[in-house]
Swiss-Prot record:
This is Oxygen-dependent coproporphyrinogen-III oxidase. The lineage of its organism: Bacteria, Pseudomonadati, Pseudomonadota, Gammaproteobacteria, Vibrionales. GO terms for cellular component: cytoplasm. PANTHER family: COPROPORPHYRINOGEN III OXIDASE, MITOCHONDRIAL, OXYGEN-DEPENDENT COPROPORPHYRINOGEN-III OXIDASE, MITOCHONDRIAL. Homodimer. Substrate binds at S99, N115, V116, R117, G265, G266, R267.
Length: 305
């Protein structure tokens, strides 16, 4: 598996993907632009490297969102990582990726998340250990069946060239991963999720990661365009803020990437970029039966689209 590994090609793609996604989301918003915060790790820190954090605020469509590129490296993996993968002990490592979350203002536009990443751990005289990961998922507040079908059909189409079962496997993985056991519900309607992908040749794994990265806006932008001008009232806004609380719960309690980043001295501002600007909690809230708010629960279980 050592041959044909091209770290620079992966990095070049990720930088270009960040540019492309930002341009497409700015066009969908029509008003706000991403502000870039380029950062570098200080010498002597646990991790070296840097990245480009891009944040959009107070747009016509997006209340807040971020599209982050990072490329970090270290001389050895943290103990939290090698406990489950002892073969990584004593290896220097690099991790690079693009991660994004968009929180729309209009409750009829779903929140979306996407991430693609590459990891490699190397040691003199031994084959490198590498893998790709990523995916995208959608969190509607007032879901429409046709939007969910478009989202999943886009995912299914991009998976098709890589194997008949890839969509089913990575959809099911997404449903399992974005699940809140303390609420007994999924975070949203899912999409794709994969990790530790290295069983194919490097070029094929890289091509799949590229397809997933580029598939995000193909799936999301048409939904944004369709829903962004839907009228809404304070009632829908309050429900959106309440449901955003679930997003916060998942990210701070369950998300592996958030926990890993905070435990390993990652850049806190970039890690917490995924948080919504406003959210609320209400004790023992139950939506009135028969209302659109009550219907959301029907979508928060794994199902075929």
């Amino acid at each position: 598996m050592k041959s044909n590994i091209d770290k620079q090609a992966v990095k070049n793609f990720l930088l270009q993907l960040q540019d492309q996604i930002c341009q497409q989301l700015e066009a969908a918003d029509g008003q706000a632009q991403f502000i870039e915060d380029a950062w570098q790790r200080e010498p002597g820190e646990k991790l070296g490297g840097g990245g480009r954090t891009r944040v959009m605020r107070d747009g016509a469509v997006f209340e807040q969102g971020g599209v982050n590129f990072s490329h970090v490296f270290g001389e050895q993996m943290p103990g939290s990582a090698t406990a489950h993968r002892p073969e990584l002990a004593g290896r220097r490592f690099e991790a690079m990726g693009v991660s994004l979350v968009m929180h729309p203002k209009n409750p009829y536009v779903p929140t979306s998340h996407a991430n693609v990443r590459y990891f490699i751990a190397e040691k003199e005289g031994e084959d490198p250990i590498w893998w790709f990961g990523g995916g995208f998922d959608l969190t509607p507040f007032y879901p429409f069946v046709e939007d969910c079908q478009l989202w999943h059909q886009t995912a299914k189409n991009l998976c098709a060239p890589f194997g008949a079962e890839i969509y089913n496997e990575h959809k099911a993985w997404c449903d399992r991963y974005f699940y809140l056991p303390h609420r007994n519900e999924t975070r949203g309607i899912g999409g794709l999720f994969f990790d530790d992908l290295n069983e194919w040749p490097f070029e094929q794994c890289f091509a799949y990661m590229q397809a997933v990265g580029e598939g995000y806006t193909q799936a999301y932008v048409p939904i944004v365009e369709k829903r962004k001008n839907t009228p809404f009232t304070e009632r829908e806004r309050q429900f959106q803020l309440y449901r955003r609380g679930r997003y916060v719960e998942f990210n701070l309690v369950l998300d592996r990437g958030t926990l890993f980043g905070l435990q390993t001295g990652g850049r806190t501002e970039s890690i917490l970029m995924s948080m919504p600007p406003l959210a609320r909690w209400e004790y023992a809230y139950q939506p009135e039966s028969g209302t659109p708010e009550a219907q959301l629960s029907e979508f928060l279980v794994p199902r075929e689209w």
